[in-house]
Regions:
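N-terminal juxtamembrane cytosolic/stromal segments of multi-pass membrane proteins
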Residues: 6-70
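Membrane-interface helix-boundary motifs at transmembrane edges
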Residues: 51-55, 108-116, 174-183
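Alpha-helical transmembrane segments of multipass membrane proteins
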Residues: 67-71, 96, 100, 127-131, ...
């Protein structure tokens, strides 16, 4: 009778809530190729478009290894002839990463730090390829001698390098959602880190071996 209909209705009532019936939202994992592509976009001052979840621990490791290999190989090509690898200098070149990660964490309180790091690791590749490519060409005598032997030309290339690195870093935190105030703070901190790197740290990890 009526009691049975009410009991039947009440039995199904808890399942009428759409939110209760839906499984939790779990966006798909972003593939490694996507992180590489979008990181390179960021390196050319374009807007990255990652989709899905942040990177996995293994993806971050792969991105770090790949970007480091590019930088290390480019540095080796700048030295003509036999060269030795300076492990201590290579390790010291990573000194600024913890400070940079803290700055990004502060600037992006609502964005996963792993997302920023995945893009930032790859975003530095284009500027390294272009600027170190010029240095490699000079070291192997491809460029006219007057290009980098001229102090103004050398300082001009150096300035382009630092402005490019700084612009990529600032734009990346901005497009990921940092406020204007925090973007400005990140830019100031990044400028300080770049200045300290240029002033206090030798980043040449390959040294020409002396014959004899």
């Amino acid at each position: 009778g009526m009691m049975q209909r009410m009991t039947k209705h009440d039995h199904h009532a808890p399942n009428d809530d759409p939110a209760a019936a839906q499984p939790p939202f779990n966006p798909p994992m972003t593939g490694l190729i996507t992180w590489l592509r979008e990181g390179l976009r960021a390196g050319w001052l374009l807007t990255p478009r990652p989709t899905g979840q942040g990177p996995s621990a293994w993806q971050l490791l792969a991105l770090a290894v790949l970007s480091t290999m590019v930088w290390t190989v480019l540095a080796r090509l700048q030295v003509v002839g036999p060269a030795s690898f300076d492990t201590q200098t290579w390790l010291a070149s990573w000194w600024s990463l913890p400070a940079l990660m803290w700055l990004a964490w502060w600037a992006l309180p609502f964005v996963s730090l792993s997302t920023w790091l995945a893009l930032a690791l790859v975003a530095g590749v284009p500027v390294e390829v272009v600027t170190q490519g010029v240095a490699i060409a000079d070291a192997h005598g491809v460029l006219p001698a007057a290009v980098l032997r001229n102090a103004w030309m050398a300082w001009g290339l150096y300035l382009i390098y630092w402005l490019w690195v700084w612009s990529v870093g600032v734009r990346l935190v901005h497009v990921l959602g940092a406020s204007r105030r925090r973007t400005a703070g990140f830019g100031l901190g990044l400028a300080v880190l770049l200045g300290l790197s240029a002033w206090q740290f030798d980043t040449r990890v390959w040294a020409a071996e002396r014959s004899g």
